[in-house]
Amino acid sequence: MTELKPLLIELGTEELPVNALPSLSRAFFEGVLAGLERRGIVIDHGEAKSLSTPRRLAVLLTAVAVEQPKQYRELFGPYLNTAFDTEGKPTKALEGFAAKCGVNWRTLERIRDTKGERFVHRVVVPGERTDALLPGILTEAIAGMPIPKPMRWGAHEYLFARPVHWLVMLFGQDVVEAEIMGVKAGRISRGHRFLYDKPVSLSDPQNYIDVLQAAYVLVDPAARRARIVAEIEAVARQVGGVARITEDNVAQVVNLVEWPSAVLCSFERVFLEVPQEALIQTMEVNQKFFPVLDSLGKLTEKFIGIANIESNDVAEVAKGYERVIRPRFSDAKFFFNEDLKQGLKAMGERLRTVTYHAKLGTLADKVARVLVLAEAIAPQIGVDPLLARRVALLSKNDLQSRMVNEFPELQGVAGHHYALISGELPEVAMAIEDAYRPRFSGDEIARSPLGKVLGLAERLDTLACGFAVGMKPTGNKDPFGLRRNALGLARTIIESRFDLDLKVLLDQASDWVAFATTIEQERHAQESVKQSKKEAAVKHSLPQVSDEKSARIEELYDFIVERLRGYYADKGIPTTHFNAVAELKPVSLYDFHRRLDAIGRFAALPEAEALAVANKRIRNILRKAEIKIPASVDATLFDQPAESGLLVALEGVITDTRSALDCKNYVSVLTCLARLRPPIDEFFDKVMVNDENLMLRANRLALLQRLGEYLCCVAAIEHLSN
């Protein structure tokens, strides 16, 4: 049985970049494992650990084979007809092969294959020792790491993310002889930079985590995360609050400390006059602090910092954190007060001075387009068009605020606060912020109907603009954020259950964008840039429907639907189901969703596969038809009972499902379609479609055409066929 030993590799460095640390740690771990596996060295993956702190990358494996397995090789020699001459003496071919193998030819074995009998030499190659292979494995692992900005240090030519100061390589209790980037491997690690700044001797990989913990280093990121969250929650409870803990913030802090310790801090209550989102943004993004909220979710004057030490004077540490945060809060308060002085209306007046796009006018022009779209969408989902007009008019004003200029992430949020202060209706103010949802993947859609209207109008205009000026996404480039906007638009429609005609909305958006580009062309053509839109509009009416415009609407529709492919894939929806619905191009995305749900249930029926195969067969027959197919079926031409049986069954299903189809009860429709399997099977078993009699053939093709159309009334079910 192969002997197994624990393996520890630790690379000690200066503080590694916080954002790069997770990927560096993962690549280091995977590189070491891949190197061992490539060499056939047995590893117990169940106990493999990837460990890291800001000052070290480590791989801990509890069971690694001490050597490669033996390799059994076969060297094939000449066949007998070329191995011996006519006198039965070995030829040069046989003697040369034996010499190459280092044996007498008489000791060679013989095997038989399809060409005859030949000589073979079997040899057992002992595996190399793992400790001899580890230096090369480590070198390969380091070379394969994604280092964002490699650096040199001292007089060395080595390149790494940060200077390397020590290297631990223990295989069992033995040090592996190696030298990496000018550092010789040993058993000496280092403790915490401040709490235990001295060498730490490691005798056994199995004790690594415990020995480092005694030196004030939690080398397991999961352990640091657990301690950070537990301490933050405990400290917040002490002051009767609830800590705001986001995954992004915790992930950053985990990679900033080796020995986390929560510190309660506070700031002056006067800063709470500033919108809490600005203060939270400053604490979390700029300083990696954790805000403390009250039971209603309102920000308190308390916050929590995570120190990398256990201080004897926690109050002094807290003062340091408070000194850091105070100037930033003062700036936020200044920006807020300056914005209040000018007011939301004045901010909006400056939008006409900001270019949205050279071919699309200013931000004020964009607001005008969004306003018209919002008015059109509002009554379709039960929202007051006047409110939609008002919220659209105010929607971009905060882009000219000092607050948003300093904190771009607060666009919409700042507008919400300024609208309330200006006396706008609460639902109008909320919609200004709400329309930006979803802001990122996994975020919730807008909560209020008014916010949804504005969000849809905004995204429709952005999409139409992007395509109109040739800013379609290519590869990783998406300057208008069209992919994100398309998915946000689709999610809002589907998750809100809005039965809207997407192509009509895209048509309206494209009209106004085309109008905007016409106006801009007119502006540039005139000597005076002050020519009004009214003057230009006299000369240029809204574009009429054209082939080019229709093609663009289809392109936009396809672009939006394609974004749903990944959305549904994440929900476990098979691609075949998605393709089945997408082929029909439902104009309502909510209708698309309902069809997709129904096809999922239909696919579970025992008849589904057979009907899918039948529909595929029908399509193939119709595609290959070389005669004109009548528009209707003539029952008097039937000469087989299976023909009339199929037509009767089909007409019965059509009658029984007409109401369900009108009500878009697609599950009921597809369930009824399952009744057609027996007559379809009977038809294909008993009837020759391509009969020599052209009248019979044409009539049977007409029957199949009608059947095929109804089988696809919900989705193109042939996609379900395996």
Curated annotation (Swiss-Prot):
Its main location: cytoplasm. It comes from Xylella fastidiosa (strain M12). One of its GO terms (biological process) is arginyl-tRNA aminoacylation. It is an enzyme of class 6 (ligase). This is Glycine--tRNA ligase beta subunit. It holds the Pfam family DALR_1. It is found in: Cytoplasm. HAMAP family: Gly_tRNA_synth_beta (MF_00255). NCBIfam families: glyS. It comes from the Bacteria. Keywords: Aminoacyl-tRNA synthetase, ATP-binding, Cytoplasm, Ligase, Nucleotide-binding, Protein biosynthesis. Tetramer of two alpha and two beta subunits. Its EC number is 6.1.1.14. InterPro entries: DALR_anticod-bd, Gly-tRNA-synth_bsu, Gly-tRNA-synth_heterodimer. The keyword Cytoplasm applies. It catalyses: tRNA(Gly) + glycine + ATP = glycyl-tRNA(Gly) + AMP + diphosphate. Belongs to the class-II aminoacyl-tRNA synthetase family. One of its GO terms (cellular component) is cytosol. GO terms for molecular function: arginine-tRNA ligase activity; ATP binding; glycine-tRNA ligase activity. Transmembrane segments: none annotated.
